[in-house]
Each structure stands twice: as structure tokens, then as C-alpha cells.
């Protein structure tokens, strides 16, 4: 009887590990319910008519920066030019002259009188070419409201501009939209698609919670006046990146920022084919994330830390329980994992459905849940040891 009693009594190590797993579980629950569920909650509120939008449709300047992307322009530009919107112009800034982009844009201008294009001079040396392209597009624009996307992005409907514009209230200066991938095959694309979805749930979730801290230029709008008030990119002119995320980090406030989550306001990119492209994109954002103002960066990092610690603690508690024949302790540890997984699967997949992502995450979710923060730490670690000159303008 004494041996049985000892087997059922948890030692101090088991109690500490199990209590740690329980505490980390509660932290993760708070993050999912209060942050990652925001997009789904907003989508539901919009459907129920609980969100205010403006009825005005001010003229818009759409700015697209393309770097030798004639194929992307042929594929995607038509969907931008044929938006159902009363008054807008499309400005394409072409960086590079080694492909057919220039000829194609010249021909297209004859069909679409609201299309204009310019180019980045080859001699430009004192500002990153992307920031120069954005600046040239803004200076060439006629209208106050600027909407940005990339040449490799296609709006999912002709209502994209109308849905972005319904957020252009008198107090609004910044509108953040969602950009995703078209469905593709392969492990690389699946990882990138989940990372993109989860990253969007995070930064759009913060914005919907009243704490905007970044934006992505694939689907973004702001006022021209705001750009000039900030003297363009002067605050980080020495960096290659930062034309979208770092700029929005400096200008976005709870009062001046709104988020558009309608599925018809989404732009999508083609599936990833090369790991190098994804790596460069992630490293680029990791290099500017170090300069973000506000607590959001640290709160996001804390979620990553508690996620990894939770997985380590529940696994440790279950293994120790099994080795000591404490089946109740092992069962409680596994139950914590199961409860978090269930809540996570519900929120992630509801958000994916709201954003019309074609992929759902069930059996692959635990793997992506571990890989995503490890990948994030990998990019940050790479930035830490990469020469600073690699992130400066050339």
C-alpha cells in the first residue's frame, strides 16, 4: 500500500513542471482569445453590421513598384486596372530595363487612360531603390489617398478598392489589408503560407486591438499628407528595407489606423517556388523589426517564448509522469496540450475560412506551431550576425 501511495504522490519536480505547463497554458489561452482571434471577431462584427464604414469614395492613386516583372504585370495588372471604382489612377514605377516591362506598360497605357508609369534611374545611389520607387510614385500621384500593392499580387475581386475605401473616414490615415498566397504544393509553400497567415493574425490582431505596429506593402493604404508630414523615409533612409513595415510603425496610432478583413479586399501572390526568395523576405523584415517602436514587438516575442516553453514543459511533465507511473500527472499534461491544440485549431481555421484561405490546418498544425517560432528565431539570429552593411542602402 505504501508503494502504491508513493506512486500516486507527485514529487516537487513533477509539481513544478506541471504547474509551469499550466501557467504557460493560461498565457497562451490569453494570446489566442485576446489577439489571434481578432480577425475572426472583426469579420463576424462586420457581417452583423456592428462596424461603421464611410459611404464616400474619394479618388485613389494605386502605386505599384515593379523590378523587372513583366510576367507578373501581364498576369496581375489587369485586375488592378479594372477595379469597380469611380475615380482612380494606377502608377507603375518600373525598376530595371532588362525585360519587356517598359514596352508592355506603354502599350497598355493606350487601352487604359488611368494608367501611368515611370522608372527608377539607374544612377540612383543615395536611397534604397524600393524607397526611391515608392517616393517617385507618391510624387507622381494626383490624389490624397494612396493604395499600395506589388506587381506579383492580384486582387481577388473588382471590389478591392471599394472595400479599402470604406475605411477612409475623416479620422483615418492608415488602412491595413490582408495579403495571402494562392494555393500551392510542396513543403516550402505550406510552411510559408502558414507563416504568412499567422504573422497576419498577429500584426492585424494588434491593430484591431488598438495597437498597430507594422504594415505590409502588398495591401496597404495611407494619406499622401501623412507621407510628407513624416518627410518620407528620412527617419530610416540609410536602410534598404522599411518602406512599409517601419514607416507604418512610425506613423500608425490607435486613432488613425483601421483594418480591412473582407475576403474580397484580399490580394494574393503566386505560390513560392524558391526558398531563397522567402528567406530574403523574412530576413528583410527581421532586420527592420529590431527598430520598431512600442511594446508590440516584445509582446510578440513573449508569445513565441511562452509557446516553445509550453511545449517543452508539457512534454517534460508527461514523460516524467510516465516514468514515475504517475498516470494522472501524465494525463493532465497531455490534456493541457489537447485543450490548447483544440482552441488553436478552431481559431486558426475560422480565421483561414474568413480570409478564404483554401488550406485548413489540423494534423499539420502542431508541426507548424513549433516550426514557425524556430524559423523566426533563425531569421533573427541570422540578422544578429550578418554584417550591418548588408541591410544598408547600396
Annotate each predicted stretch with a short phrase:
Residues 41-47, 69-82:
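Short, well-formed alpha-helical segments that are part of the catalytic scaffolds
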Residues 112-133, 137, 143, 163-234, ...:
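Long helical/loop segments within the catalytic core of UDP-sugar-dependent glycosyltransferases
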Residues 77-123:
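Acidic donor-binding segment of Leloir-type glycosyltransferases
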Residues 307-389:
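Membrane-embedded multi-pass helical conduit in multi-pass membrane proteins
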Residues 1-5:
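Short, small-residue-biased leader/transition segments that mark boundaries at the very start
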Residues 168, 174-199, 225-228, 232-297:
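Catalytic donor/gating beta->alpha subdomain of glycosyltransferases that bind UDP-sugars
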Residues 6-54:
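N-terminal membrane-anchoring/stem segments of glycan-assembly enzymes
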Residues 143-154:
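Short beta-strand-to-loop acidic/aromatic patch adjacent to the donor-nucleotide binding site
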Amino acid at each position: 500500500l505504501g508503494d502504491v501511495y508513493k506512486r500516486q504522490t507527485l514529487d516537487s519536480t513533477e509539481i513544478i513542471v506541471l504547474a509551469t505547463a499550466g501557467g504557460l497554458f493560461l498565457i497562451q489561452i490569453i494570446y489566442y482569445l485576446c489577439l489571434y482571434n481578432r480577425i475572426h471577431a472583426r469579420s463576424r462584427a462586420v457581417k452583423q453590421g456592428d462596424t461603421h464604414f464611410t459611404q464616400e469614395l474619394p479618388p485613389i492613386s494605386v502605386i505599384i513598384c515593379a523590378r523587372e516583372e513583366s510576367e507578373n504585370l501581364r498576369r496581375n495588372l489587369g485586375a488592378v486596372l479594372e477595379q469597380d471604382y469611380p475615380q482612380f489612377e494606377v502608377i507603375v514605377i518600373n525598376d530595371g530595363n532588362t525585360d519587356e516591362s517598359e514596352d508592355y506598360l506603354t502599350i497598355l497605357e493606350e487601352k487604359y487612360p488611368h494608367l501611368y508609369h515611370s522608372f527608377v534611374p539607374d544612377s540612383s545611389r543615395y536611397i534604397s531603390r524600393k524607397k526611391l520607387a515608392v517616393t517617385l510614385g507618391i510624387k507622381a500621384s494626383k490624389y490624397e489617398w494612396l493604395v499600395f500593392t506589388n506587381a506579383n499580387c492580384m486582387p481577388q475581386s473588382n471590389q478591392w478598392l471599394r472595400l479599402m475605401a470604406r475605411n477612409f473616414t475623416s479620422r483615418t490615415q492608415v488602412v491595413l489589408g490582408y495579403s495571402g498566397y494562392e494555393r500551392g504544393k510542396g513543403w516550402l509553400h505550406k510552411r510559408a503560407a502558414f507563416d504568412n497567415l499567422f504573422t497576419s493574425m498577429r500584426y492585424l490582431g494588434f491593430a484591431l486591438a488598438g495597437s498597430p505596429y507594422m504594415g505590409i506593402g502588398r495591401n496597404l493604404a495611407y494619406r499622401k499628407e501623412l507621407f510628407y508630414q513624416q518627410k518620407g523615409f528620412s527617419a530610416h533612409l540609410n536602410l534598404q528595407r522599411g518602406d512599409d513595415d517601419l514607416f507604418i510603425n512610425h506613423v500608425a496610432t490607435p486613432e488613425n489606423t483601421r483594418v480591412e478583413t473582407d475576403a474580397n479586399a484580399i490580394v494574393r501572390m503566386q505560390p513560392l517556388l524558391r526558398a531563397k526568395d522567402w528567406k530574403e523576405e523574412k530576413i528583410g523584415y527581421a532586420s527592420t523589426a529590431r527598430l520598431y517602436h512600442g511594446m508590440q514587438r516584445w509582446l510578440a516575442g513573449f508569445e513565441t517564448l511562452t509557446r516553445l516553453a509550453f511545449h517543452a514543459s508539457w512534454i517534460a511533465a508527461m514523460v516524467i509522469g510516465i516514468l514515475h507511473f504517475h498516470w494522472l500527472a501524465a494525463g493532465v499534461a497531455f490534456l493541457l496540450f489537447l485543450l490548447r491544440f483544440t482552441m488553436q485549431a478552431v481559431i486558426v481555421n475560422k480565421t483561414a475560412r474568413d480570409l478564404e484561405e483554401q488550406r485548413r490546418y489540423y494534423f499539420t498544425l502542431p508541426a507548424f506551431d513549433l516550426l514557425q517560432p524556430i524559423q523566426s528565431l533563425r531569421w533573427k539570429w541570422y540578422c544578429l550576425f550578418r554584417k550591418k552593411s548588408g541591410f544598408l542602402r547600396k
